[in-house]
Amino acid sequence: MRLPREIGPIHFVGIGGIGMSGIAEVLCNLGYTVQGSDASEGANVVRLREKGVKVTVGHKAGNVNGADVLVVSTAIKRDNPELMAARAQRIPVVRRAEMLAELMRLKSCVAIAGTHGKTTTTSMVATLLDAGDFDPTVINGGIINAYGTNARLGAGEWMVVEADESDGTFLKLPTDVAIVTNVDAEHLDHFKTFDAVQDAFRSFVENVPFYGFAVMCIDHPVVQAMVGRIEDRRIITYGQNPQADVRLVDLAPNGGGSHFKVMFRNRKTDAAHEISDLVLPMPGPHNALNATAAIAVAHELGITDATIRKALAAFGGVKRRFTRTGEWNGVTVIDDYGHHPVEIAAVLKAARESTDGRVIAVVQPHRYTRLQALFEEFCTCFNDADTVVVADVYPAGETPIVGIDRDHFVLGLRAHGHREVVPLPESAALAGIIADLAKQGDYVVCLGAGNITQWAYALPGELKALG
């Protein structure tokens, strides 16, 4: 039995969230009656309303009246008035991943997992399958610039989804093709130990059916070790590693992007194949690796080399992934979601490759617990930044932790040898600081998962206002 077409209103609590909004949009496009609520207005709420979805701002018990099912994410607390009202009325309550799994049951599915790179890789897989006339349905964790949304309903038999591992619910997703980009010690608030994180990713791959396959990056030592422990499943490895089945080679910066080729090696026959002259309009080795994963899937599904090459060269990127928000006197301002040390280091390396000028990082640490758990890593991931401007920690609902704040982070960066670290007293002071620091050819890279994205978009105009 599948999700009945005649089911009444499906109510999403927190419908404006990036994960929830994509599922709601696809359900709406399929003809289901969708409604929801969110704590505030936002771009996703506006977009859903334009599609005819009723969205209420604020969580109130009366919002669920008449709903046949309630969809919640793990961010919704047990004392949420809508959740409590639904349970009092015996309305079925499902987690976000469970509803996503219902949609995935309708299609053959590619699911992209990993601590970093999921959203970009999901977008790349979707782009290549779209170019190959697969017309996929897509549910992503970020806004795909080519679509102007994080979700689309396709008429084809394939679905491409971002598999969020943060709460372990990605194990519920019925996956035919799994991608694992990397595995780091993240989301320990849920998993408790890194061993548990690794076990979850291993289960994710082992859940792939015998007729499916997994694409795994063996440049990452944890993933390479995991490959050696997985039995009875078809694995395609990728990376710059000479042992990879799909190998990224001859990578070179190319005018703000990358130029490379990909080599395929069949382990059974030792036959080789090459796709040369690949151009990706995004900088950084990490993005070239993400593209290699997408190419591996596209090649396996029969998409031609020429189609892959053309689609990759036209890839429009993802919002908040090395997004240029504007320029001022030859200074480029970049907005990026990077909030983990591995991501920050990769983004700054990409910035360093993209300019002959200086790289100025503006970082808004996200969550006290993350800064505390990875303090050493945070203090050593800014090596490619000439200057680091440090804002207050974005709490994301957390209680402050003594000794884990902006000023201690500034001291930590300096103690680890960084030459120029500037504390940001308030967001209103950012334009003045950048105006004093930046020169023509410099990149200003705003990093974080909080509201720093708003600063990044406002900064070019604020700089122009200063003269």
Curated annotation (Swiss-Prot):
Key word Nucleotide-binding present: yes
GO aspect biological process, one term: cell wall organization
InterPro entries: Mur-like_cat_sf, Mur_ligase_C, Mur_ligase_C_dom_sf, Mur_ligase_cen, Mur_ligase_N, MurCDEF_pg_biosynth, UDP-N-AcMur_Ala_ligase_MurC
Pfam families for the chain: Mur_ligase, Mur_ligase_C, Mur_ligase_M
Pathway terms, separated by semicolons: Cell wall biogenesis; peptidoglycan biosynthesis
Keywords of this entry: ATP-binding, Cell cycle, Cell division, Cell shape, Cell wall biogenesis/degradation, Cytoplasm, Ligase, Nucleotide-binding, Peptidoglycan synthesis
EC number: 6.3.2.8
Keyword match Cytoplasm: yes
Top-level EC class as recorded in UniProt: ligase
Chief place of localization: cytoplasm
One cellular component (GO) term of this entry: cytoplasm
Superkingdom of the source species: Bacteria
Cellular compartment(s): Cytoplasm
NCBIfam families attached to this UniProt entry: murC (TIGR01082)
Similarity-based family: Belongs to the MurCDEF family.
Database matches in HAMAP family: MurC (MF_00046)
Functional summary from the UniProt entry: Cell wall formation.
Name of the protein in its database record: UDP-N-acetylmuramate--L-alanine ligase
Gene name for this UniProt entry: murC
